Amino acid sequence: MDKEKFYITTPIYYPSGNPHIGHCYTTVACDSIARFRRMQGYDVLFLTGTDEHGLKIEQKAAEKGVTPKAYVDEIVAIFKKLWSYMNISYDRYIRTTDDYHIETVQKIFKELYDRGYIYKGEYKGKYCTPCESFWTESQLVDGKCPECGRAVTEAAEEAYFFKLSPFADRIEKLLLETDYLQPKSRAVELVNNFIKPGLEDLCVSRTSFTWGIPVTFDPGHVVYVWVDALSNYISALGYLNDKYDDFDRYWPADVHMVAKDIMRFHAIIWPAMLMALDLPLPKHLAVHGWITFNGQKMSKSIGNVVDPLVLGERYGADAIRYHILREMALGADSSFSNEIMINRINADLANDLGNLVSRTVAMAEKYFGGTLPECREADEELDASLIDPALELRDKVATYMDQTQLNNALAEIFKVISRANKYIDETTPWILGKDESRKARLASVLYNLLEVIRITTTLLSCFMPTSMPKAWAQIGATENLITYENAAKFGVLPANVTVHKGDALFPRIDTDKEIDELNALIKAQMEKAIAAQQPKAEVPGVAQIAFDDFSKIELRVAEITDCEPIKRAKKLLKLQVNDGDGSRQIVSGIAPWYKPEDLIGKKVVIVANLKPAKLCGEMSNGMLLAGDVGDDDVQVLFVDGMPAGTQIR
């Protein structure tokens, strides 16, 4: 009988720079799910890749004096090197510059045009080149791009548009009445912010740059990002191309995993495209948060980007895989810090798991020469307190994996590992070993521990595929015993199993020394980044002002007491702040970078004497200070150590 299929995808990553820990999380999470499904017996297809077209790529290539293809080739090689190092078991790697993908996109575009869902029009508005986006006057924030805060220019461009409105009702039902979107809490947000106000037709072509897929029937146009990028999930299966022929086998996808910044495109635009093509919809869209550094969004421009290769070289790929998966709950942001990472590695991997394996193997060697005798003596109640949770573990883990809650799956495994360590303390094998008449009981205790190690490391092998085979070698578990079926059985190891002492699975890290060294690395990164951002001695086009003019600006610390999105403006947040003299309302274009609930209680610097202005129908009485740190990244200046009302001089 044919195996049941399972198709899982990462987003295709934009190779405008080297991969970082955020890319790593999504890919490691998908890899762990793919490995778990393979262990369950599924026919798995795991897809990842890179999204290689667009104006930004064209511009970056020009800056380096190379062709766009040569530019992306270099960065794609770095992505693949990282995935190899992190032991990512992808089955296919798609590039949007692949000929077969280009063929599929061109045919999809023509099919949507022929069906009347794509039409030709003109896009007018304020254009932001770095964001490759048009904006209406009302969407601008202080006259600038609401995405990145940069200056915009008046522009009009002939373009093709995709009709979204015909699919609004079906998409609303998809989000609210099915379990397509995980976590489900995101569904209401999408419906209220995007569907209820009315879905606007989507611009799907450009004439202002050439690095893209040409529209076959109108070669002056190239296909714009989302029709190109989203189609990868089906072009990689051979849809409308001859590269592969398993579209009917694997589609629809079982899981698309993406970060929250591209949730809208996968939750609204992608289903609409599939509906227009009369294709089945994916089963699940799993949306995760961002990994921040010490609570601050990572940015290459300020030098706080965490390089997974650097960490992996210090602690091993499996330790990094475990840490990022254990720390992030689906849908929530996770703050990365050197202290948390090292403490997690020491506590869970070195102490709990590593010590369990090393102590058990060492005692088997010490008291039985490495081979357990077949005699047994049970303590039914005490043994059951270890064996029963171990037997229930596999199905608990499977439930969490079905829900894409990898952190909870790992937590369940480590509960059983913790129970095994406690079992050692309760059974006192070092005392049993001194009494010849208790050797049968000692053999039972050690065998129970070895079986728990087998079960837990079998399940952990999906998350840490390099280290767990080392544990199996130490406990005498041959490869044929490491199966999904055996993970719910007790008594699989031979009664007279032979153990083999080996190196520590995860050596303990000197916390203070490592933190000092890592902090020094980050500091050096930040100093280098800051130096690179320093302005030249003379900045053409920027007028100098007198000190008297500058002194008219009143900068004051204010505490954010409430914050909410503005439904009519996707980029704006409405903040209530206490400036020391009372409450005032400020509207700020920071929604792409901050969630409202994360800002409440934060202290910020505001321009307190700015003339009030109305933005999208809301009065804004001031402006908060934020920095444009590059890479389409804006960061608010937080001053949590100062009381509200403090004057900034």
What is each of the regions a protein language model found here?
Residues 1-48, 100-104, 148, 154-366, ...:
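Structured secondary-structure scaffolds
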Residues 115-168, 172:
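Cys/His-rich short segments
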Residues 2-75, 94-110, 114, 131, ...:
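N-terminal catalytic cores of NTP/NDP-binding nucleotidyl/phosphoryl-transfer enzymes
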Residues 531-649:
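Phosphate-backbone binding interfaces of nucleic-acid-interacting proteins
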Residues 471-549:
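Intrinsic disorder at enzyme termini
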Residues 75-89:
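A glycine-rich helix N-cap at a beta->alpha junction
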Residues 86-95, 113-126, 138-139, 153-155, ...:
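Short secondary-structure capping/junction motifs at helix and strand boundaries
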